[in-house]
Swiss-Prot record:
Cofactor(s) required for function per UniProt: Mg(2+)
Signal peptide: none
Localization terms from the record: Cell membrane
Effect caused by changing S396D: No apparent gain of activity
Keywords recorded for this protein, A-Z: ATP-binding, Cell membrane, Isopeptide bond, Lipid transport, Magnesium, Membrane, Metal-binding, Nucleotide-binding, Phosphoprotein, Protein transport, Translocase, Transmembrane, Transmembrane helix, Transport, Ubl conjugation
Positions that bind a 1,2-diacyl-sn-glycero-3-phospho-L-serine: R1436
One example GO MF annotation: phosphatidylserine floppase activity
Organism: Saccharomyces cerevisiae (strain ATCC 204508 / S288c) (Baker's yeast)
Segments of skewed composition (Basic and acidic residues): 364-373
Modified residues (Phosphothreonine): T70, T782
Protein name (Swiss-Prot/TrEMBL): Phospholipid-transporting ATPase DNF2
UniProt PTM comment: Phosphorylated by FPK1 and KIN82.
Region (Involved in phosphatidylcholine substrate selection): 272-279, 631-635
Amino acid sequence: MSSPSKPTSPFVDDIEHESGSASNGLSSMSPFDDSFQFEKPSSAHGNIEVAKTGGSVLKRQSKPMKDISTPDLSKVTFDGIDDYSNDNDINDDDELNGKKTEIHEHENEVDDDLHSFQATPMPNTGGFEDVELDNNEGSNNDSQADHKLKRVRFGTRRNKSGRIDINRSKTLKWAKKNFHNAIDEFSTKEDSLENSALQNRSDELRTVYYNLPLPEDMLDEDGLPLAVYPRNKIRTTKYTPLTFFPKNILFQFHNFANIYFLILLILGAFQIFGVTNPGFASVPLIVIVIITAIKDGIEDSRRTVLDLEVNNTRTHILSGVKNENVAVDNVSLWRRFKKANTRALIKIFEYFSENLTAAGREKKLQKKREELRRKRNSRSFGPRGSLDSIGSYRMSADFGRPSLDYENLNQTMSQANRYNDGENLVDRTLQPNPECRFAKDYWKNVKVGDIVRVHNNDEIPADMILLSTSDVDGACYVETKNLDGETNLKVRQSLKCSKIIKSSRDITRTKFWVESEGPHANLYSYQGNFKWQDTQNGNIRNEPVNINNLLLRGCTLRNTKWAMGMVIFTGDDTKIMINAGVTPTKKSRISRELNFSVILNFVLLFILCFTAGIVNGVYYKQKPRSRDYFEFGTIGGSASTNGFVSFWVAVILYQSLVPISLYISVEIIKTAQAIFIYTDVLLYNAKLDYPCTPKSWNISDDLGQIEYIFSDKTGTLTQNVMEFKKCTINGVSYGRAYTEALAGLRKRQGVDVESEGRREKEEIAKDRETMIDELRSMSDNTQFCPEDLTFVSKEIVEDLKGSSGDHQQKCCEHFLLALALCHSVLVEPNKDDPKKLDIKAQSPDESALVSTARQLGYSFVGSSKSGLIVEIQGVQKEFQVLNVLEFNSSRKRMSCIIKIPGSTPKDEPKALLICKGADSVIYSRLDRTQNDATLLEKTALHLEEYATEGLRTLCLAQRELTWSEYERWVKTYDVAAASVTNREEELDKVTDVIERELILLGGTAIEDRLQDGVPDSIALLAEAGIKLWVLTGDKVETAINIGFSCNVLNNDMELLVVKASGEDVEEFGSDPIQVVNNLVTKYLREKFGMSGSEEELKEAKREHGLPQGNFAVIIDGDALKVALNGEEMRRKFLLLCKNCKAVLCCRVSPAQKAAVVKLVKKTLDVMTLAIGDGSNDVAMIQSADVGVGIAGEEGRQAVMCSDYAIGQFRYVTRLVLVHGKWCYKRLAEMIPQFFYKNVIFTLSLFWYGIYNNFDGSYLFEYTYLTFYNLAFTSVPVILLAVLDQDVSDTVSMLVPQLYRVGILRKEWNQTKFLWYMLDGVYQSVICFFFPYLAYHKNMVVTENGLGLDHRYFVGVFVTAIAVTSCNFYVFMEQYRWDWFCGLFICLSLAVFYGWTGIWTSSSSSNEFYKGAARVFAQPAYWAVLFVGVLFCLLPRFTIDCIRKIFYPKDIEIVREMWLRGDFDLYPQGYDPTDPSRPRINEIRPLTDFKEPISLDTHFDGVSHSQETIVTEEIPMSILNGEQGSRKGYRVSTTLERRDQLSPVTTTNNLPRRSMASARGNKLRTSLDRTREEMLANHQLDTRYSVERARASLDLPGINHAETLLSQRSRDR
């Protein structure tokens, strides 16, 4: 019995039918089920029939449908068309080429509304030419609906009669009642994005119908759809022209500082508070608000333009068919008027911009060129335009169907291949709708359930299910660059049942519905079911829909003439919009700590104001000794009232103690810093044409405080450009290479790797030339390209010729054929040479494997309708692919199943499964009886050798199936593939059954080369005090060898291995949790004498130096999962890693990467940086304080989610050590300077209040209060934060130890802030009391006999001393003195004197009139100014001089060396990580430096006494030229020669292992015997076959030969 909760079938006329094909998940309640019956309608229901099923009552329209029984289609023709196999016969565009004149006549008759559109179908055609309609939102189509449907909007209610209910309150209540609060008009765009991004709504299932009425349970009481889908119109803007002013003002006054100053302005507007000029007092706030509004307006205007362009983009929507899934929008006259005005303004703006400016005319011309190019390209692509040039291969018309896109997908194409051509959607018994046509319309008018056709080079307007394409097999190319950043083309496949649809006439003769999961953010997952009624037997048919059948909004159609699809998600439900709001907002550490400084100033402000209120109230109470200074004194009538008013007067008077311009100044500074980073040419990657791009402009100072860097390996430390180097086939190893990891291993053995590497590479080059000649002579390989040959082995060419016997020849052929068949790559003609095919792979590994097979004569040249085309030694063969079982991270393997025909037509065919995957996975699935034991041992030893060289290894295997075995399995597979829920898990279970009992073919080894400058970059970061953790998904041995080659590990380190299981840890128990806990506890106790207590963790948080021990932690994913589980376990694991110099986490998932970053960041309270290049690094990047994305080979998703984007890993050293240190030091000096200068000015007023009972009178003329921060003192401080440099970028890179001051937080802390505040208090005393003592008795008389005792005149003295001392104080604290900064210091002083002279010459200055002439003319003024400034600056200058001479900081020592010219031999911008850097061989030694410096491992950036300074290492070793072996540029903290290890060439030094079982001992004895034989026969390289890192335990996950064999020998 069907479940009543399932959606009902749209078919209502047939009462009894057999059930169709079953599907899991969203099975519809079909009227063809036996349990479905009609009851006799009662009078209460009128003309509605009621259907009962399973106890539920379903309403149905009684109007019967047409008979859907299947006639004899062989006798049925329509419009003279009886052949549906030829695309050219039924394509809209091709059919009407001869009728353009008549169609253009119809186009000219098109009106703005669909009502006026009339067109006549041409005879013998499949539809209509696309007609462009100016279809506004308010347009309705009479052919689409019998009655108008109104879409709910605020203030516009829909109803059947078309009447509009204007009552907005009732409308809102009605909408909430019927749609369960599903109205989103009242929420902001940001909220909707955030909610949709954070919530997984995949369980919100939806059913979308085409050409069918909705079931009654999906309609409301008015017969309108219950489901409300978002419009396809997007709005990323915050404002509209009408709402910009109020919303922007409201947004700005969410800032507490702005609210605070607004309250003060409101208070100042009341005369009782004594503000002299309230209007002038509002100038600073008005300026800040206007500047911010202009900035916001410019930013939002760009978004508005982009929104308009996107929403008004044209696409082709099928018209003439009623879309039952949505209600038609009813647009009110007011909205029509607003939209008409908006369109008119846009048109006017476009007209003037395109016709009155040169840039606009050029843009208009470019648009016309693009349109012509698009139309030309659209006509040029046939059924397989991208493969047309392969016609020289003389393939059939079906040749060229590309493979599917399998990356990160867990879906399949096999179920689509199960349908015959007769099992399709088109019901030829139905008459085509003559009013149905594809018409151009705006993206914003696309709705769920619409049929959309997209042409070549057009973007996809919404997420839609692909129904058909111009290609005969329903495939199309899409570019997903806008979605995930990847530039390689991907293939999407139309549904098998609908690929025959080629025209608007065909689609009108179909009826179907889609059961879909809800919207979610996963770009690589989609599950749904496509259902229709079989025209032959009336059963409900089902075809599963997966991500391969989905075209996502934002993608672009490429190399395909057109594609047709059904819209399933629109607007905010599309995946690109859901992912738009994922990136979190980050705030820098200084910005967070700045709040505490502001609070301290508020406390100080309150104390001053409270004091003023108390004093003034007390004096008011003592009337005989006080005066009523204010008019309110007689009104208040009490001391308490007087004190209360005086408190707020003081708040207004001392408001500058909390600087209003601080926040906007910080924003300006960080913007400038981001611009400098972006324009740094030394961070520009010329190969990618990619500069360092700041995406988060407000965290630049965090770059200078990084203590931990978390890095991915593949694509980050390595290039992710895979090169096939070696392989093992039938126990024979092929290939010769000298890898970087091998060079690092040989270097640890004490070998001169430069000479050995040069010799090896010369021999490899000779073998390569020989191999190329032999390959050319062996066969006519049309795809052979010597430049792409990375696999060098002349032996394999000889074996392919049969020199080692037929058996080895067959093994090599089978191995290479497996490489050519088991993959998911695409091929396209090369643009320069169409006969050559370019490989388009989803991963570099697959590209390397397929490319190597091609070079050896097994070329994959394309796909046919039924399989793959492989050119074998010049002869093309077709292989029918039955199924492809995709790779995913949990399976760690992929397989393909090939059909093998019988030897005779009567023989039953067979199925061959080819599987490739991780060596450990393949070995565990090998058949224990059909594989030769010696062969497995040899292969395992070869794989061990490859992994030791740092190569990535894979294994290939196969299994032969009988046809009956395959048919039984594929039935279960199809059921799993049709499941909507848990489809991935079901598929994994089914594939696990068949991927067993495999026969080993061999193994491959691929090199992922290190990026340029990685070893030097890591060495510099380590010397800077930055700890590097490598978080990778690679196997442990590969990661370790890469770690040694890139300086993460060194030979002096002891590796502390943490793993959850294995024979070596049996003594710790069998429970993984117990094993990991015991291991970590043992290491803490034995190596560091720690127990893992809370007190030890608190002590570790205070320690920021480098670990004293020489240890490294190696942990795999299973052990890491245990280590992150539980507070105690996390604490112990973190303490262990904290005391180690390097940490390698291997086989970790993206979620584990993010968890490790969060653990370190939150627990240790340190600054973290995460760097990666792939989508699996996004979580880690977003979890760190600073996320850096590398624009690499794995797409740009990491770049899009990062805070900074760079081209290579080595650029992070300059980003951190140079720009990070500069930004941190600048901002750390600017902020206390900002508070300091305000304290001087504000406290001068406070001292003045002592002598007037704090009555609130102003010492300064009021304009001084406004311009002091705005013009007199702001520019020097801002220039300090933008341009100051402690040392040059070259010195910063050569002496990375200078960076440690940021890690130790020496430049910015509350102690420094309080010190500046105290200095400001002292200088405020000087600024006020020096002029006061000089003038308080009016001893100075001017020439005209007038005194200078007016408070405004005295205020000129105070202001002049404060402005001059502040600006000179800033100049003194700068490291960089140049004419530019000096110029602005002078200009700031000139502004003060210029304004005073200009303002006092105007009578508007009232009491201040002629003040400048009277004050500046007195010699006493200049004397007081000089003495006041001298006493302000002399104490600080004296203290700084004493400290620098007797207690210098390391930066001051290095600066003296730099200024003396000790680094002059290094060119400007010298980068030790740049491979193309100049070599510095001769450096002038230091012979007259008074005292050597200490820059050893204890360097902390703080001051040292003379007694503690000792001669040691860096940079003295640099300056004395002692860096010959260090390449002349690396700043190293240790120059001692490392102990050289003798090469190990025997097996006696193999690590001892705990073999607890007899099986293990027997296995080891056999393997040792095989190893010795191979060594004797020179089948293993003795240089590194037994090399092992010094480790506490056998390394986890290292696929030693015995490890692989033990996995095989275990019972499954």
